[in-house]
Swiss-Prot record:
Residues 289-465 form the Helicase ATP-binding domain. A motif (DEAD box) lies at residues 412-415. Residues 28-46, 149-182, 197-233 have a biased composition (Acidic residues). Transmembrane segments: none annotated. This is ATP-dependent RNA helicase DRS1. Residues 57-68, 725-736, 759-771 have a biased composition (Basic residues).
Length: 771
């Protein structure tokens, strides 16, 4: 019996694997899956996964009901797929404007380089000095009954400033949501109110048309038409030889893409654009993106605020989707003239490519921590946004940073980068960058650069895409001009009167451009003593102060920003309503970049310019009116130029208040100077202690090299080049002699020191030989 039981067990064991090894065929699958027993125990997770993976049973008889059920299931699957493909797309009819959820680009440095959280150096508390002197409290020249609300707003702002001085870090981290709500409210509901306010101002202030402004300027500055000089333009033959065929550019302009999907971009890029609220490409974007994706060189120009940064950043990110995954190298370099513009471009790229895997950005700008940038560049990021000087420094002195595998070079604000100020640095960068198989993209709002300047870039038949004329302002910009005549001393009071007339409940951002850094600082002190919160932005500030000023202005903690031409190019701070030219710029191109800070991306804006008596000021006004009249002939929606009338009696009364505070202004400047000297002494003391403690480590570091010596730096400017010969300084006498030799004219002989000495050494006669 035992033997029989063993045999039966063996048979059962032989039968079990035969059932396990049973393989399903297509026919058996259709017969039914439930007939096959599951002999192994499964976990709940495996059962759920298998239930999801199980195909639905297909019955043999085909009926109409089953067909209907299949159609319903297919429709459900299609809707699910569409939801998965486009989860965050929002369609609007506002062109290429950003949605209300997007509040502009960030001007902060990430991770270890976050200078907003850990300031490297201490700064002088100028607002504290102004409060001790009686400023930043009550707005000068305002009635208490009328402006009770304004005084309440100002008192709240003063309390916020005191809290900011106690804890800057908590303010920057905790108030972001409140600022977003304020900006969203302004963007959604305040447009009609601001338009009505503008209409009320227009009714109160009589304005002249373009012809009236031009006639007034002609009366004030007669005979200046003869001084206008026409610039030398490139011939048609030279342009045909240098640029690609014009048909390619014209066809690109005609192809107006209504959506970004028609540009055949990848899904991660489209998702990033939808996250920013971009639905319709701008004309410069629809024209340049297809050409850039083909790998061709581009020389492009469009008005300010037309989306030029995204026009070159979108095809770059699309191209980097197909890079080798295992090889990390820097493939793209973007050059920008200012640090703030480079930080903004870096944020634009990060937000467009936020859904792209393995896409890294690097930032190399001056004023920030050099060692942290070296550590970031060691990882060899795909895209490096840099200013020219710091890029050369890293190429020469950072050991693990190389640009041998560079594929794309972008020069933003190309006309400024090709000027003589960046000439030496740009030629050095071009000598270090490989020329073979390099794509070069040039973008600017005033791209009127000559071919002679572009030859050094070694472009390969670039496509010239000019969406707008090189000297044209935005369509919805209203340009106002105030004739100062002989009232230059009233300009600070006039500026205060204009800013005070703006309704504070509208949360307007106002940018004031000045010519000199000293005047920007002094205006901040004057307006602060008059009770107005103002920030400044210029080259004398540290990089931490510059970024803090931009962030405070962006977050509306400070509504007025006084700056030099440092902020005239590229900065895209949303909802800047008014630009005031306190000092006239040197050229019409700089004027266009200044007024281009407002009326961006199809919005409305206003510029107010103080016009002096010089012929240069009059020429800029004439060019502005001329460009408007030319555009009005082409496009009826073009902006207008008007002459603004001012109540000079009120300005003179305000000027008396300003003059009464002259001694206080000097006291503030002296106190600030003493505080700066104390901080400088503390810095020198800490520097000396570090030199004593870490002497060996500091001396062991290799010296950083530069492509120019100190003497070469001094002889860079035009004036020094004219006054020098072969690197040596030439005095006035030698320079005059050289000029005379060039003119081939005779010059009267002048006794030298040797001649005078030889006359003195001659012996005097004793008179013996006299008869």
């Amino acid at each position: 019996m035992a033997k029989k039981s063993n045999k039966s067990n063996k048979l059962s064991t032989l039968q079990k694997p035969s059932q396990k090894d049973f393989i399903l065929t297509i026919d058996s699958d259709s017969e039914g899956e439930n007939e096959i027993p599951d002999l192994e125990e499964e976990s709940e997770v495996d059962q759920e996964l298998k239930e999801e993976e199980k195909p639905k049973p297909k019955p043999k008889p085909k009926s109409k009901k089953n067909k209907k059920n299949k159609d319903i299931n297919n429709d459900q699957e299609k809707t699910e797929e569409q939801e998965e493909i486009n989860p965050n797309f929002t369609f609007s009819l506002d062109g290429f404007e950003t949605s209300t959820a997007f509040d502009g680009w960030d001007f902060k440095v990430e991770s270890n380089g976050d200078v907003t959280k850990k300031p490297i150096s201490k700064d002088v508390d100028l607002d504290g000095i102004l409060r001790r002197k009686g400023g930043l409290a009550n707005l000068a020249g305002s009635d208490v009954k009328v402006d009770e609300k304004n005084d309440e707003v100002e008192s709240e702002e003063v309390e916020e400033v005191e809290e900011d001085d106690e804890d800057e870090e908590n303010e920057q981290e905790g108030d972001d949501d409140d600022d977003e709500l304020a900006l969203d409210g302004f963007g959604m509901s305040a447009t009609e109110a601001s338009a009505n306010a503008d209409d009320d101002q227009d009714e109160q202030e009589p304005e002249d048309d373009d012809e009236g402004v031009e006639a007034d300027m002609d009366e004030e500055y007669p005979g200046s038409d003869q001084e206008d000089e026409k610039p030398v333009e490139d011939t048609a033959e030279d342009m045909a030889e240098f640029y690609a065929d014009e048909e390619e550019a014209t066809t690109a302009k005609k192809q107006l893409h209504t959506t970004f999907q028609s540009l055949q971009l990848s899904r991660p890029v489209l998702k990033g654009l939808s996250q920013l609220g971009y639905t319709k490409p701008s004309p410069i974007q629809s024209a340049c993106i297809p050409i850039a994706l083909l790998g061709k060189d581009i020389v492009a120009g469009a008005v300010t605020g037309s989306g030029k940064t995204a026009a070159y950043m979108i095809p770059i990110i699309e191209r980097l989707l197909y890079k080798p995954a295992k090889i990390s190298s820097t493939r793209v370099i973007v050059l920008a003239p200012t640090r703030e513009l480079a930080i903004q471009v870096c944020d634009v790229g990060k937000k467009i490519g936020q859904f792209v895997n393995n896409l890294n950005f690097g930032l190399a700008v001056g004023g920030l921590n050099l060692r942290q940038q070296e550590q970031q560049l060691k990882t060899r990021p795909d895209i490096v946004i840099a200013t020219p000087g710091r890029l050369i420094d890293h190429i020469r002195n950072s050991p693990s940073f190389s640009i041998d595998s560079l594929e794309v070079l972008v020069i933003d604000e190309a006309d400024r980068m090709l000027d003589e100020g960046f000439q030496a640095e740009l030629t050095e960068i071009l000598s270090l960058i490989p020329r073979h198989k390099r794509q070069t993209l040039l973008y600017s709002a005033t791209m009127n650069t000559k071919i002679q300047d572009l030859i050094q870039l070694s472009l390969q038949k670039p496509v010239r895409v000019m969406i707008d004329p090189p000297k044209s302002a935005a369509i919805k910009l209203v340009q106002e001009f105030v004739r100062i005549r002989k009232r230059d001393h009233l300009k600070p009071a006039l500026l205060f009167q204009l800013i005070k007339s703006v309704d504070p409940s509208q949360q307007n951002r106002i940018v004031v451009f000045v010519a000199r850094k000293e005047s920007a600082h002094k205006l901040r002190i004057i307006l602060g003593l008059l009770g107005m919160r103002v920030s400044e932005l210029h080259g004398s500030l540290t990089q931490e102060q510059r970024l803090a000023s931009v962030n405070d202005f962006k977050n509306l903690t400070v509504p007025v920003l006084i700056c030099t031409d440092l902020a005239a190019r590229g900065l895209d701070i949303p909802k800047i309503e008014i630009v005031i030219n306190y000092d006239m710029p040197k050229t019409h191109e700089i004027y266009l970049h200044r007024v281009g800070r407002t009326a961006r991306a199809g919005r409305e804006g206003k510029s107010i310019t103080f016009v002096g008596e010089s012929t240069q000021d009059r020429a800029i006004v004439k060019d502005a009116i001329k460009s408007i009249s030319e555009e009005q002939a082409r496009n009826s929606k073009q902006g207008k130029a008007v002459s603004r009338n001012v109540d000079w009696k009120e300005v003179e009364e305000l000027n008396k208040i300003v003059e009464s505070k002259a001694t206080v202004i000097e006291e503030v400047l002296d106190e600030e100077k003493q505080a700066k000297e104390m901080l400088h002494a503390e810095m020198e003391l800490s520097k000396a202690t570090n030199m004593i403690k870490h002497e060996k480590e500091i001396q062991s570091r290799p010296r950083r090299t530069w492509f120019e010596s100190e003497k070469d730096k001094k002889h860079q400017t035009e004036v020094m080049q004219q006054l020098t010969k072969h690197g040596k300084k030439v005095n006035s006498h030698k320079r005059k002699a050289i000029e005379v030799k060039k003119e081939n004219s005779s010059r009267s002989y002048k006794k030298t020191k040797q001649d005078r000495m030889s006359v003195q050494k001659k012996p005097k006669s004793n008179g013996k030989n006299k008869k």
